[in-house]
């Protein structure tokens, strides 16, 4: 089996798939808004028609994964319940209801009489998306790709191969029925192909890895294709001294236990020293009753946290029912801790002091900074994007949950009437630079 640290040369079969995908993406980029909406509705219809087969495939994948002994967090992401499938199908339809991201005029400017400049949004081209376990991501990513006029090459975790194949088969039926090229969605099933994808710079315009920090860094260092980075989700929640304790506990619980395998689940809880005793007195029994393993610094350990933390805990994304707890002297210490250990995904503060909230949100350089709400809101669907293709923790845009707006770029269109630069250099013509 190909090691993750090998980048093989694409074989002829993969090259042929990439060529077909590239051609299909060009065709998709030329479709109009109504065509793409119709395609999405039909893709959702065929997912519904094939839901029994999709669930059965997932049950088989899950059984095999259990036998292999994969982690609880991966098993949680792998499991596709009927409810989760229905939510995914509804998400496909909702993407169709979003404003068309293609062809939006961002600038329209008269440079001189008869010389008109436009900047318009256009599809990126072909997306290469590598992700782990979550089969519902196939629906999200594919719908966003088609809605934005792109093609997409998908590589999910091998533990979800049967589920992913069943989902992609249904999506392709929808594309066929809508008269769009079914090759606009391409699924790879081997690790060798996923690594060889990194050498497809002639065919792929953007790679979006959704996996471990190790995987993301490796991809960034081993491809000439631009990478939209989504590394670890080491999210923090700071409980201030001016706080409604009941609200703080409710938000902290939701941030950890609502879906602990998610990248936006909180991993470290920071508590002001003046609040710590009263908060932990209420929080420890609640976390214990929800099977959360609490790991704390010496101060929180002395206040009843069961296990003592080490340095590694502050930089660990557990993706499980485990929570690190640290007691801090003040807001400044909380900010310093987050600046040191945060993966720049999502960090939040619980406080009644608006000045403290504003200071926290201004100084924390994460893609999402939250005040008095759960970190679990850091999600494209919850932001109203319809769905997300990934979350970017980089500083340059797109940043945070990436929906449709992150899957288009722009081109400059300049239309003239035989204009030449020399006429402007000589003074025969002048620039008007007037927005129209």
Swiss-Prot record:
It catalyses: L-glutamate 5-semialdehyde + phosphate + NADP(+) = L-glutamyl 5-phosphate + NADPH + H(+). InterPro entries: Ald_DH/histidinol_DH, Ald_DH_C, Ald_DH_N, Aldehyde_DH_dom, G-glutamylP_reductase_CS, Glu-5-SA_DH, GPR_dom. One of its GO terms (biological process) is L-proline biosynthetic process. Keywords: Amino-acid biosynthesis, Cytoplasm, NADP, Oxidoreductase, Proline biosynthesis. Pathway: Amino-acid biosynthesis; L-proline biosynthesis; L-glutamate 5-semialdehyde from L-glutamate: step 2/2. It comes from the Bacteria. HAMAP family: ProA. Belongs to the gamma-glutamyl phosphate reductase family. This is Gamma-glutamyl phosphate reductase. It comes from Prochlorococcus marinus subsp. pastoris (strain CCMP1986 / NIES-2087 / MED4). The lineage of its organism: Bacteria, Bacillati, Cyanobacteriota, Cyanophyceae, Synechococcales. The gene is proA.
């Amino acid at each position: 089996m190909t090691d993750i640290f090998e980048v093989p040369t694409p074989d002829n079969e993969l090259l042929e798939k990439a060529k077909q995908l590239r051609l299909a993406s060009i065709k998709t980029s030329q479709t109009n808004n109504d065509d793409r909406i119709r395609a999405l509705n039909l893709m959702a219809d065929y997912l519904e028609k094939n839901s029994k087969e999709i669930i059965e495939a997932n049950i088989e994948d899950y059984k095999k994964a259990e036998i292999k002994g994969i982690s609880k967090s991966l098993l949680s992401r792998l499991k596709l319940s009927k409810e989760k499938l229905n939510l995914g199908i509804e998400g496909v339809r909702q993407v169709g209801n979003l404003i068309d991201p293609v062809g939006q005029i961002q600038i329209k400017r008269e440079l001189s009489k008869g010389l008109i400049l436009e900047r318009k949004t256009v599809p990126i081209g072909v997306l290469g998306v590598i992700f782990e376990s979550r089969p519902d991501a196939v629906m999200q990513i594919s719908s966003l790709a088609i809605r934005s006029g792109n093609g997409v090459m998908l590589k999910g975790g091998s533990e979800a191969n049967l589920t992913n194949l069943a989902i992609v088969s249904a999506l392709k039926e929808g594309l066929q029925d809508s008269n769009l090229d079914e090759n606009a969605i391409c699924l790879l099933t081997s690790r060798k192909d996923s690594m060889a994808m990194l050498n497809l710079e002639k065919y792929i315009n953007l790679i979006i890895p959704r996996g471990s920090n190790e995987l993301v860094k490796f991809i960034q260092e081993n491809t000439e294709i631009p990478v939209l980075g989504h590394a670890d989700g080491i999210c923090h929640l700071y409980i201030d001294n001016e706080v409604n304790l009941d609200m703080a506990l409710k938000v902290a619980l939701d941030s950890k236990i609502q879906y602990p395998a998610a990248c936006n689940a909180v991993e470290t809880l920071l508590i002001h020293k003046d609040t710590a005793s009263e908060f932990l007195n209420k929080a420890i029994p609640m976390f214990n009753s929800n099977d959360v393993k609490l790991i704390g610094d010496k101060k929180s350990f002395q206040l009843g946290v069961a296990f003592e933390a080490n340095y590694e805990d502050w930089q660990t994304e557990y993706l499980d029912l485990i929570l690190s707890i640290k007691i801090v002297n003040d807001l400044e210490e909380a900010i310093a801790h987050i600046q040191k250990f945060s993966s720049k995904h999502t960090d939040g503060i619980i406080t009644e002091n608006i000045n403290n909230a504003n200071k926290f949100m201004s100084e924390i350089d994460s893609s999402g900074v939250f005040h008095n709400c759960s970190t679990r809101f850091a999600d494209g669907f919850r932001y109203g994007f319809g769905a997300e293709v990934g979350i970017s923790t980089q500083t340059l845009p797109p940043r945070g949950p990436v929906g449709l707006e992150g899957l288009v770029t722009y081109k400059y269109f300049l239309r003239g009437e035989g204009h030449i630069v020399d006429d402007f250099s000589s003074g025969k013509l002048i620039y008007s630079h007037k927005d129209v």
